From Swiss-Prot:
First-level EC class: transferase
Lineage, opening ranks: Bacteria, Pseudomonadati, Pseudomonadota, Gammaproteobacteria, Pasteurellales
MF terms in GO: 6,7-dimethyl-8-ribityllumazine synthase activity
Protein name per its UniProtKB record: 6,7-dimethyl-8-ribityllumazine synthase
Native source organism of the sequence: Actinobacillus pleuropneumoniae serotype 5b (strain L20)
Keyword Zinc among UniProt keywords: no
Positions with a binding annotation for 5-amino-6-(D-ribitylamino)uracil: 22, 56-58, 80-82, 113
Sequence positions that bind (2S)-2-hydroxy-3-oxobutyl phosphate: 85-86, 127
Amino acid sequence: MAKITGNLVATGLKFGIVTARFNDFINDKLLSGAIDTLVRHGAYENDIDTAWVPGAFEIPLVAKKMATSGKYDAVICLGTVISGSTTHYDYVCNEAAKGIGAVALETGVPVIFGVLTTENIEQAIERAGTKAGNKGSECALGAIEIVNVLKAI
């Protein structure tokens, strides 16, 4: 029985990153964490392109454009949706998650879900590099690994 695994070497890989402007004070940290991790694992900065979109709801469209361009080995999607007093949060979270997942399945390109969905701003800040690590960095690791798993198959 073969065991297929992916390494964490990003040398020679190209990445697209889609980041939401809404809650940019958190998303900037997610983006920095992702880029830092990609570079530390061998990616060159000129092999990383970033696109900014208004909010999490708009991420899937740009992720699909990147994924179908043929330029990227993986696309990382970053954003933050913080619960409020209305159901808007539920709609945005659900549609962003469905859309991002659909892009990966439709294109065969790894598309990583890095949209924080938190109950409050404190949880978001914790996940952007304070107490709970940096989810942008974790998404970058996931992107590197899944690209290499797919190459090994």
